[in-house]
């Protein structure tokens, strides 16, 4: 199914109102209490984090809500901890049982992923209407077991196909109220992204292969008399050792940022529902600068600028996202509310245990 949008649809931009100072206070309290309670408070910390970002994300004058119960998240984590304890004790006394646990985990992984996605979606709401996620084990197993096996058998060549199928699985099974989302991207869109990234890696490898033989002799002979070895503490030797990191790390980060940015744009620009379509216009250069400067700031501040970094990237991503709609959003929401009420469900039956990762 493909929806045709009018030539002049109404564009509703997303806005983000989060502030670093506000979020820092939430973040530091979460960290301290999680440590003091040996991780028990981390369930409440997760809810507080999500509620802050949701409540500061605005669309057409309204903000989003995160409705999860921290106790449900704590139950899920305690359950996971219990399973891990059983695994550890059993493997300690019966080492040959480890493959059985590994196979059981792989078999249960699709169910865990569906449950996590369902919990997160049904605890997210906009204008009192919950989002939804509906899938089954068989469909999830194809995406999260079958295709990864294909990726291994093809030595990674099928990874772009996995990237496509994962987003297709998530978007096509997601919905807002009773209205489902659709995804009209194709695998070729993702192959093109990774092909460009692979080409950049090849170019980087060629440049390094050409440059190193020319650079190393120059560095060695810079302050070296004939017949002498370069001192271990020589600035030239230190620079020669740091040069690959200083050059290659930013390039690898740039390539990774390109893949991430292009994938986000592709996923949003091909996600739609009846009469509505998303529009994402993230720029690789801007994203790269944000990630690089965030990395440096967090490193130099020993982690204290993590809240500032999170607010910064969230603001840029959301302020470059918009919803194009044929009709007034108020009318769409009102119609959706009537359909939800007519079903008698209100999509409020959520799992009481969060098994999210």
Predicted regions and their residues:
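Active-site-proximal cofactor/substrate-binding loop regions of enzyme domains
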Residues: 34, 41, 63, 69-75, ...
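Hydrophobic alpha-helical transmembrane segments of multi-pass integral membrane proteins
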Residues: 32-33, 74-88, 104-112, 146-154, ...
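Hydrophobic, aromatic-rich membrane-embedded alpha-helical segments
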Residues: 28-47, 106, 144-165, 292-312
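Short hydrophobic helical membrane-anchoring segments positioned at the boundary
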Residues: 298, 328-357
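Membrane-interface extramembranous regions at the lipid-water interface
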Residues: 1-29, 44-79, 115-144, 162-197, ...
């Amino acid at each position: 199914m493909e929806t045709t949008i009018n030539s002049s649809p109404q564009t509703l931009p997303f806005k983000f109102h989060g502030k670093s100072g506000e979020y820092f206070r939430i973040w530091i309290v979460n960290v301290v209490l999680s440590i003091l309670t040996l991780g028990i408070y981390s369930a409440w910390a997760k809810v507080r984090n999500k509620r802050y970002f949701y409540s500061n994300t605005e669309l057409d004058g309204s903000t989003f809500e995160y409705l999860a119960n921290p106790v449900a998240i704590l139950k899920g984590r305690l359950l996971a901890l219990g399973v891990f304890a059983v695994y550890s004790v059993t493997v300690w006394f019966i080492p040959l049982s480890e493959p059985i646990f590994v196979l059981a985990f792989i078999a249960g992984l699709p169910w865990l992923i569906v449950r996590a996605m369902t919990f997160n979606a049904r605890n997210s709401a906009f204008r009192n209407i919950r989002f939804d996620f509906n899938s089954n084990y068989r469909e999830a197993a194809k995406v999260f077991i079958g295709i990864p096996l294909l990726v291994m058998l093809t030595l990674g060549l099928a990874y772009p196909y996995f990237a496509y199928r994962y987003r297709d699985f998530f978007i096509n099974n997601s919905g807002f109220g009773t209205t489902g989302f659709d995804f009209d991207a194709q695998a070729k869109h993702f192959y093109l992204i990774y092909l460009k990234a692979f080409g950049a890696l090849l170019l980087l490898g060629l440049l390094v292969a050409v440059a190193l033989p020319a650079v190393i002799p120059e560095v060695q002979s810079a302050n070296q008399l004939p017949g002498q070895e370069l001192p271990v503490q020589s600035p030239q030797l230190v620079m020669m050792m740091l040069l690959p990191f200083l050059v290659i790390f930013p390039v690898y980060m740039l390539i990774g940022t390109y893949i991430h940015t292009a994938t986000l744009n592709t996923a949003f620009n091909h996600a739609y529902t009846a009469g509505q379509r998303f529009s994402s216009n993230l720029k690789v250069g801007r994203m790269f600068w944000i990630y690089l400067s965030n990395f440096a700031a967090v490193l130099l501040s020993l982690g204290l600028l993590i809240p500032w970094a999170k607010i910064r990237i969230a603001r840029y991503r959301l302020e470059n996202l918009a919803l194009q709609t044929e009709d007034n959003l108020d009318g769409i929401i009102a119609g959706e509310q009537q359909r939800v009420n007519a079903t008698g469900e209100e999509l409020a039956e959520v799992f009481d245990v969060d098994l999210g990762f």
